[in-house]
Amino acid sequence: MALRFPRFSQGLAQDPTTRRIWFGIATAHDFESHDDITEERLYQNIFASHFGQLAIIFLWTSGNLFHVAWQGNFESWVQDPLHVRPIAHAIWDPHFGQPAVEAFTRGGAPGPVNIAYSGVYQWWYTIGLRTNEDLYTGALFLLFISAISLIAGWLHLQPKWKPSVSWFKNAESRLNHHLSGLFGVSSLAWTGHLVHVAIPASRGESVRWNNFLDVLPHPQGLGPLFTGQWNLYAQNPDSSSHLFGTSQGAGTAILTLLGGFHPQTQSLWLTDMAHHHLAIAFIFLIAGHMYRTNFGIGHSMKDLLDAHIPPGGRLGRGHKGLYDTINNSIHFQLGLALASLGVITSLVAQHMYSLPAYAFIAQDFTTQAALYTHHQYIAGFIMTGAFAHGAIFFIRDYNPEQNEDNVLARMLEHKEAIISHLSWASLFLGFHTLGLYVHNDVMLAFGTPEKQILIEPIFAQWIQSAHGKTSYGFDILLSSTSGPAFNAGRSIWLPGWLNAVNENSNSLFLTIGPGDFLVHHAIALGLHTTTLILVKGALDARGSKLMPDKKDFGYSFPCDGPGRGGTCDISAWDAFYLAVFWMLNTIGWVTFYWHWKHITLWQGNVSQFNESSTYLMGWLRDYLWLNSSQLINGYNPFGMNSLSVWAWMFLFGHLVWATGFMFLISWRGYWQELIETLAWAHERTPLANLIRWRDKPVALSIVQARLVGLAHFSVGYIFTYAAFLIASTSGKFG
């Protein structure tokens, strides 16, 4: 008999139904469950797939550069970044006739194009790229790196080049490589690029391979470094009248602590960023050398963790046993990595708009909105993934004997306290926040808006004041003009920071009021509820009072039959599934808040947000409905405009989202009956019955149907909001 898909599971390959195909796809990447897997092959497969992932990333970034160089308008954008709209790529085959061709021909292009809202133009401009040739060179280089990555992945699957399990489990060497080799060296290299290429470019000087060795990045070269006069590198920074990309008003400093923003570009000073990356490089180069590798000096991770036993005895045996638990569990490591990456991605979203690093990106409002939303959604998915793999760790990898009375075991032992506290916090936030919103709605409806309950966020305002915001009149720390911190800030460190905090032309410490207070607590509700579901899923993954033997059923199971009532929907997978809905809900509130606050800020009518955000009808009417009007009018009986593609995507997103409910509400029995009826009809229809199938058609499992429903819900939700966001912002600001 010929080998059938899936080759990695003989049991599935011999399944006579279509379950073979769907379960095969579902478990293709679950290497641990494959027939002939060994620990060594598991690690090697994952290692090789990392190179494949890198190849895809480099190919994708190469494609961005290539298409902008080929079909974009980078060189004309560079001449006037604030008024030329950056082109992402051409539209090959514009449908819907001449009106569409005219609507999408913009940015000085000869034909229909898509506008770039990704910020790549600003990024490339900031780091010193100026011509299409520069972009082509970058694209080719990244294509080369992509090919190298593919070759490396293939090479590490060959017998001679396969790393051993001991190599993968050498934690200290891995820390050395990742901290010093990847973070440290790459940060140092990036500092080098900023100092040698980007900063000269910002001052009108082009540094390329042909003059790279001739141009001194600083008039005194390496002299100050070797003589210990490092402060010379900070002297004579760019002036406040500096025109970015020219020598007008330019200085000679390369490593500064100015603080605040370049007045023209509204982005952080390049010399501050070079200084930052140099500091990061220094820290990580040291951090990577703290652990014992080949030379018998430095810390051993195992010794460190085993020594972490708090003397009071309140945490039992502390971190004893954790080294082997983490080092032998890929799911634990992946959970930690995803949790870290999720937090970092959300921080990227927050900092890209509040402390913009790229020249002129702060004035490209649609790009700001798109990047914030993009990074917050990605953070949400990554964070839910972290808890999913944490739960899989508890089911597949956790060994109670190895972890007796350590912090991990003790957390499992008092999980009831953790879960009930999260539940209490969620209930408190939910009832109080909704109560305030609904009270305010009723007051508005009865024509007595003055009876709203409006709470000033005084603690948050106090924190903003402590960081230098003076408008609240708190007179504390950095907002206290007589304090030592304020005076030091004026001269010694970050003199531009206090100006930036108190200017109204950026998004640093926006003025907040009762509307912000309410939506902050709505978001807190979403975060706590999502966390409750995810934490409960992981802590109950091995078993609960209701189902003590849960771990024997694996990560995802629908129920344990009709004999054990109430065992449906309690697998760790079900917790992940429910949490994703709450995560999307939360990110929705986060992005609605950010977008509405900023739209009113950019339009100069902040009072609209302040007055309408204190009750639910305000959000529905003055944010969602008001801003979707242009979108819904993207095409009409009289023709179409450049928002039509977003109008179509808005409709299509709703369709995909609604399709999700078909799978989420009607379950397996319905589909099984439908399939059997369709199969009966097929077999009795002339011509159609000439086509036969080897696998008996059966409905998806309950868990799979839920996944299909969840995927449609998520994709539709994001498509709908992406179209709304981009159309409503670009429709107002271009």
UniProtKB/Swiss-Prot annotation:
Enzyme Commission number: 1.97.1.12
Please classify the protein's predominant subcellular localization into one broad category.
plastid
**One Gene Ontology molecular-function label:** 4 iron, 4 sulfur cluster binding
Q: List ligand-binding residues for chlorophyll a B3.
A: 662, 670
**Which Gene3D superfamilies did the record assign?**
Photosystem I PsaA/PsaB
- One GO cellular component term: chloroplast thylakoid membrane
Listed transmembrane segments: 46-69, 135-158, 175-199, 273-291, 330-353, 369-395, 417-439, 517-535, 575-596, 643-665, 707-727
For this chain's record, the cofactor binding note is: P700 is a chlorophyll a/chlorophyll a' dimer, A0 is one or more chlorophyll a, A1 is one or both phylloquinones and FX is a shared 4Fe-4S iron-sulfur center.
Supply the enzyme class, top level. oxidoreductase
| List of residues binding [4Fe-4S] cluster | 559, 568
Q: List the disulfide bonds.
A: none
Q: What does it catalyze? A: reduced [plastocyanin] + hnu + oxidized [2Fe-2S]-[ferredoxin] = oxidized [plastocyanin] + reduced [2Fe-2S]-[ferredoxin]
Which key words are in the record? 4Fe-4S, Chlorophyll, Chloroplast, Chromophore, Electron transport, Iron, Iron-sulfur, Magnesium, Membrane, Metal-binding, Oxidoreductase, Photosynthesis, Photosystem I, Plastid, Thylakoid, Transmembrane, Transmembrane helix, Transport
Q: Which residues bind chlorophyll a B1?
A: 654
The record gives the membrane topology as: Multi-pass membrane protein
Which Gene Ontology terms describe the biological processes this protein takes part in?
A: photosynthesis
Residues at which phylloquinone binds: 671
**What is the stated purpose of this protein?**
PsaA and PsaB bind P700, the primary electron donor of photosystem I (PSI), as well as the electron acceptors A0, A1 and FX. PSI is a plastocyanin-ferredoxin oxidoreductase, converting photonic excitation into a charge separation, which transfers an electron from the donor P700 chlorophyll pair to the spectroscopically characterized acceptors A0, A1, FX, FA and FB in turn. Oxidized P700 is reduced on the lumenal side of the thylakoid membrane by plastocyanin.
What PANTHER family is this protein classified in? OUTER MEMBRANE PROTEIN, OMPA-RELATED (PTHR30128), PHOTOSYSTEM I P700 CHLOROPHYLL A APOPROTEIN A1-RELATED (PTHR30128:SF19)
The entry's family comment says: Belongs to the PsaA/PsaB family.
What name does UniProt use for this protein?
A: Photosystem I P700 chlorophyll a apoprotein A2
